[in-house]
């Protein structure tokens, strides 16, 4: 209830949008937003007018037309009679494959190098420093080209692995030999590796859109998941017993039994074995071949990104108070156990945020795969499909949207992990 002595409230005036500090910030934000929207509309209209002048329209119907080109490495069934959309999916899967493997390998290698950079051994520390400074100060594209050239030019041709009857009679050996008990052959065409095979099959289920999935693989995945869940329950129970009685029960052999006995029994029942590559007259048959384009890209991405991750790990370790190390030594922990149980767990809070940026950089840097003819998203959608259809704007926008989605997904997952390891405070 207003009192008679209260001063009358001034009414709203348009001048208050500029001179009144309560409204000025809102006015500025609205003006900036309107200018941004006006600029966006102008750009879109300009693109539409230019496309119309060239007799083009803006649509994505080209994705459902026949692709007409083959891909050397595919993770799902694909032929040149499939659509450009399926080629896009294949390129996306290839991108995700090299990105996920690259992030895992670069993290492992970078962590090792980061720890070794702090080694008390002068030679080891200097070697790691040379590695870091060398790899992170040379452009990634050059490393990719170098790895591709080394693999293509220094490895023997497949026929050099063949042992002919004349060579047997003369007691000669082939010019090249396989590695790891004659199971791996690295040629100038690719790396031939043993492939998993089964004597018995549970069948194949079609998920639709020509995506067959082996029931053997689903059964293996289900058993592994159940074993892992059972092991987690067992370890939780062991921890509860330790907290209640002060004595920790034996866990190593039950853990091995829970984790490996079920999957071993399943693999034995399915007749699991390895299909080894065999040399024929001109090339290898059996097993599977990993193309050098994929190998060169993966090695280059791993070594390059690991150099940056090593510096992040080193900085994270140095951020931990030296008193933590001294306290661990006082408790009788050895240096290795101190690093794994005391220092690194605390350093993760410092390491993870910049590590997210390196994962994002590696994923985006994988678009350089076209340099060694690896058919990722850039090679399919942004390469052959773009050239065949002439849909430059649509292809570029799609690629930008896909890479944005991948990056936001990685960032969200890593932020969730970072939140889970944060120091819990009241």
Swiss-Prot record:
UniProt keywords (A-Z) are: Amino-acid transport, Cell inner membrane, Cell membrane, Membrane, Transmembrane, Transmembrane helix, Transport
Q: Which Gene3D superfamilies match?
A: MetI-like (1.10.3720.10)
Cellular location of this protein? Cell inner membrane
- Any one of the GO BP annotations: amino acid transport
Membrane-crossing ranges are 25-45, 96-116, 132-152, 211-231, 252-272, 293-313, 340-360, 396-416
User: How is the quaternary structure described?
Assistant: BztB and BztC form a heterodimer which can form a membrane complex with a homodimer of BztD.
Q: What is this protein called in UniProt?
A: Glutamate/glutamine/aspartate/asparagine transport system permease protein BztB
Q: Which organism is it from?
A: Rhodobacter capsulatus (strain ATCC BAA-309 / NBRC 16581 / SB1003)
């Amino acid at each position: 209830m207003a009192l008679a002595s209260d001063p009358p409230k001034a009414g709203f005036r348009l001048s208050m949008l500029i001179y009144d500090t309560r409204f000025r910030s809102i006015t500025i934000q609205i003006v900036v937003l309107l200018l941004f929207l006006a600029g966006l509309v102008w750009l879109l209209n300009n693109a539409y007018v230019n496309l119309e002048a060239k007799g083009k329209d803006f649509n994505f119907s080209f994705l459902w037309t026949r692709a007409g080109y083959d891909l050397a490495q595919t993770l799902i069934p694909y032929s040149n009679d499939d659509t450009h959309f399926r080629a896009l999916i294949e390129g996306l899967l290839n991108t995700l494959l090299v990105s996920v493997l690259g992030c895992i390998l670069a993290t492992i290698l970078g962590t090792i190098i980061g720890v070794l950079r702090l080694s008390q051994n002068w030679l080891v520390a200097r070697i790691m420093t040379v590695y870091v400074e060398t790899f992170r100060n040379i452009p990634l594209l050059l490393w990719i080209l170098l790895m591709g050239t080394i693999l293509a030019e220094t490895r023997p041709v497949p026929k050099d692995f063949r042992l002919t009857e004349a060579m047997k009679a003369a007691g000669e050996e082939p010019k090249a030999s396989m590695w790891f008990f004659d199971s791996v052959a690295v040629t100038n065409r690719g790396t031939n590796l043993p492939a998993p095979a089964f004597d018995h099959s549970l069948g194949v289920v079609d998920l639709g859109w020509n995506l067959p999935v082996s029931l053997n693989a689903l059964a293996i995945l289900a058993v592994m998941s159940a074993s892992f869940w059972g092991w987690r329950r067992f370890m939780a129970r062991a921890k509860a017993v330790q907290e209640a009685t002060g004595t920790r029960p034996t866990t190593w052999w039950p853990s091995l039994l829970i984790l490996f006995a079920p999957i071993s029994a399943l693999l034995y029942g399915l007749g699991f074995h390895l299909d080894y590559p065999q040399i024929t007259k001109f090339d290898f048959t059996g097993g599977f071949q990993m193309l050098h384009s994929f190998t060169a890209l993966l090695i280059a991405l791993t070594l390059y990104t690991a150099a940056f991750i090593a510096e992040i790990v080193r900085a994270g370790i140095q951020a931990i108070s030296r008193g933590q190390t001294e306290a661990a030594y006082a408790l009788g922990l050895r240096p290795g156990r101190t690093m794994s149980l005391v220092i690194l767990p605390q350093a993760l809070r410092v390491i993870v945020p910049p590590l997210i940026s390196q994962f994002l950089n590696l994923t985006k840097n994988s678009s350089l795969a076209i340099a060694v003819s690896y058919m990722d998203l850039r090679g399919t959608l942004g390469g052959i499909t773009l050239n065949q259809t002439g849909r430059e704007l649509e292809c570029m926008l799609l690629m930008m949207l896909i890479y944005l989605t991948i990056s936001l997904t990685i960032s969200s997952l890593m932020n969730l992990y970072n939140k889970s390891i944060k120091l819990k405070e009241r």
